[in-house]
Curated annotation (Swiss-Prot):
Ranges of biased composition (kind: Basic and acidic residues): 514-529, 540-553
UniProt xrefs under SUPFAM superfamilies: Actin-like ATPase domain, Heat shock protein 70kD (HSP70), C-terminal subdomain, Heat shock protein 70kD (HSP70), peptide-binding domain
An example Gene Ontology molecular-function term: ATP-dependent protein folding chaperone
Region of interest called Disordered, as start-end residue ranges on this chain: 514-554, 603-639
HAMAP family (alphabetical): DnaK
Underlying gene: dnaK
Protein name: Chaperone protein DnaK
Amino acid sequence: MAKVIGIDLGTTNSCVAIMDGSQPRVIENAEGARTTPSIVAFTDDERLAGQSAKRQAVTNPENTIFGVKRLIGRRINDEHLEKDKKNLPFEIVDGGNGDAWVKAKGETYSPSQISAFILQKMKETAESYLGEDVTQAVITVPAYFNDAQRQATKDAGKIAGLEVLRIINEPTAAALAYGLDKKETRTIAVYDLGGGTFDVTILEIDDGLFEVKSTNGDTFLGGEDFDMRIVNYLAEEFKKENSVDLTQDKMALQRLKEAAEKAKIELSSASQTEINQPFISMGSNGQPLHMVMKLTRAKLESLVGDLIKASIKPCAAALKDAGLSKGDIDEVVLVGGMTRMPKVIDEVTKFFGKEPHKGVNPDEVVAMGAAIQAGVLQGDVKDVVLLDVTPLSMGIETLGGVFTRLIDRNTTIPTKKSQIFSTADDNQSAVTLRVFQGEREMAADNKILGQFNLEGIPPAPRGVPQIEVTFDIDANGIVSVGAKDKGTGKEQQITIQASGGLSDDDIEAMVREAEENAEADKDRKDLVETRNQAESLVHGTEKSLEEHGEKVDPSTVEAIELALGALKETLETDDTAKIKGGIQNVTEAAMRLGEAIYKAEADKAEAAQDGAPEEEERGVDEDIVDADFEDLDDDRKRG
């Protein structure tokens, strides 16, 4: 049976894992790293993903896309995107349906597409390790992702050629990895501060039963925000000193971002670091400007103190929703790279009143949990039951624009709930159901998930028709809504898609494009490997010809030189088949050179042997079988 893989699709880095026997195993990528940068870049002739995309970001900032998870499932007019638009070197545009898309090399891409390119990279990593095709996956999302964001993540999996068996919340996945072998009953808080999002989840673990009690968070709070605080500080200090605004230079901005991320990481273990960026800009006099600045841990903490405190409020809300106090928490588990920051650890310790658990790798534990869930779905992991919750309330807009909840936040999923509504006007023959998700009292203040009509209602006074509205949330947290006229039996049901979102046709087109690109990528890789093989063969053959050409007849030398010349000509083209043909011709011609070399050596050895005196040969034999040696051996045996 083919393996189901677990993927942590992160804002900054992604990770893939599988079940290896009874334990999850993180798979290293082609570069030997256990996590892969969630970065995609477009050059003139190829698309890059992962470390190769990150390496060229400084020289190609406008076409290098990162942090796309913060865009997924979001509208172009989202207030959170306004500040990001100013700070990002690449362009965020309207996808034509009101969704936020990105632009690179003149083409527009949905966040689901960019995420799909990252998922393809993770898929290839797993396939390379397993030696077989992978078609199914469990993918993680922030617990506080809404329906549109979950659906967009599932779309990304489909575009990448993966059947997404389950969308699982990141803190819940981390809890699975933490509690897999624990038998005693424990109540834990998972504090997950990653590259772009923050979640806190309260769970009860009891001998294989993982029950989520509550979840809270912020899908626009993470390491990217910490980085931008450092970037803005560096840019301001540089502007004060040199009267040059680096934020207007996309290449300089990308260099600052990389320097900020590096400094942030270093300050988790050091009290001070130096940021050194030579030739970062040009002065008004044409002279190059360099950035050399010191950044202390204390200064970093003052820059991001409010961001850290912003993560504590959801912790209090999650405890309240779970009906628990801080003292009821047995263990606090830290997840996400930002939890390595000492100030974050201090604030979490201060709030919960206990030292956090440090027994899990914050960068890998989510992927490991996804692999465990994959094992559960595949039947390889027994006695594990996961009960998750929906993070936000769901309902419909009723008379006066009021948000009427059908399913409250932190309801265990999967779940189904029905409620009877009626018409607002006399003789109303149709109703429009507008579905929202959120916690505000007025529908317009919440996130609209979609809308649909129920038509054919018989004329009747207002309040008489009975319309049953049913909400159904599956284990992925994705919503279906139905409406039924109890009088006529007419009903309408839809799986909610955001008012933007990708249509089935969009997804199919992107799947085809991904498949075509995969074929093109394979062809390009084949060309590069064939070209390398040809160049190596040319070099080796020319060297052999130079050293041993006199040992073969001139016609053989001429044949080899002709074949080499033809192969060099094919190397000027991008025709893989022609290059392979040239390799074959040179190999066959060079074989005669090899045969001649070995024949010449054999003839030389034979001539030397024929010229050796018989007595000398016998003398050598006598020296080998030495009487004294045999006597000594006998003495040892007797001893």
